[in-house]
Every structure is written in structure tokens, then in C-alpha cells.
Design a protein with these regions (language model features):
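Residues forming the flavin
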Residues: 1-175
């Protein structure tokens, strides 16, 4: 609890915004890149209510939905595109292997399509690697690597001259 709370506190103190109880239904495509997410409130989906979703535009989307890699699956299925994986699609995770799962979680963290980055167990699921046991060092290192890759991507594109301005553009969806 303390570790998670400290991470959330640090992110929001730096300027990140957290949207709780939202579900990502789809992504926004613009100029052949992922440019945002289509979201709805989780209770709306759970109750089967007919409410139009909202779009949140972004300069990067981080797929961290875990074992199911739901965002990557939606992107590949709906848009007939090739992902940055050995098969060009979502391969799916393999059975548990703690040591290999832990190390490949970091190795598989990458940009899988312009504007779409993948981390954590979703990185292993997309790349066809092993799931891991209850060890979270690799998960944290994967998140750190993903953040560094996103910052590098933004820097290479000439976006955000300083980190303070950059932090205003970070949104976290928890569902």
C-alpha cells in the first residue's frame, strides 16, 4: 500500500491527472498514429447504459492493461496494422516463468506503433513472452523505461521544452 500510494503521490505532485473508474474502449487515430483514447465511465459500461464515450487526445498512449493487453488488441484488430512485434500482431503471453518473465518485461517495453507504448505484463503479452510471479521489480523498471521512451519520443519531436510543461500532459486512467 505504501509503495503504490507513494507512486501515485509522486505522479500527481509532478502534475499527472488520474481518472478513476474509467474504461478505455478504443483509441483515436490521427496521421497514422495513436493520438488518444476513447473512454467511458466503468459503471456506464457495467450497467449497459447508452452513453456516448469521451475522447482524450494525447501525444502518447501507454498500454499497461496487463495480461490481456486490451488496448493493443483493439488497435491491431480494428485498424489492420502491423505492430512492432515478431508477428506484427498481439502474440499473447506464455505460461509462468518467473525469471524469464521478470527480465523480458523490461526488454519488451517499447513503442509498438507510433504513439502507442507498452509496459508491464502487457509488454510480455504483446510480445509472446512469459508471465511472471508475484515479483514487481520488473514491473516498476518497465514503467520507468516506458516513461523514458515516451520522454525521448517527445524530445525527438521537439515537444515540451521543459519537464514542468511536460508533466501537465500526463493523464493516468485506472479502471
Amino acid at each position: 500500500v505504501h509503495t503504490t500510494s507513494a507512486l501515485i503521490y509522486g505522479a500527481t505532485k509532478a502534475g499527472a491527472t488520474i481518472f478513476n473508474c474509467y474504461s478505455v474502449e478504443d483509441v483515436v487515430f490521427h496521421n497514422d498514429a495513436v493520438a488518444g483514447v476513447v473512454v467511458n465511465w466503468a459503471p456506464v459500461i457495467r450497467e449497459g447504459m447508452h452513453v456516448d464515450p469521451l475522447t482524450i487526445m494525447s501525444k502518447a498512449v501507454l498500454e499497461g492493461t496487463g495480461h490481456d493487453c486490451e488496448i493493443a488488441r483493439v488497435v491491431a484488430r480494428k485498424n489492420d496494422i502491423k505492430l512492432n512485434t515478431p508477428t506484427g500482431g498481439v502474440i499473447g503471453e506464455r505460461s509462468l516463468n518467473v525469471e524469464l518473465g521478470e527480465s523480458t518485461t523490461v526488454e519488451n517495453t517499447k513503442e509498438i506503433y507510433p504513439g502507442l507504448f507498452v509496459s508491464g505484463m502487457a509488454a510480455n503479452g504483446v510480445s509472446g513472452s512469459f508471465r511472471m510471479g508475484p515479483i514487481f521489480g520488473g514491473m516498476l523498471m518497465s514503467g520507468k523505461k516506458a516513461a523514458e521512451l515516451i520522454v525521448l519520443s517527445w524530445t525527438n519531436k521537439g515537444l515540451f521544452p521543459n519537464n514542468k510543461e511536460m508533466s501537465k500532459h500526463i493523464f493516468i486512467t485506472i479502471f
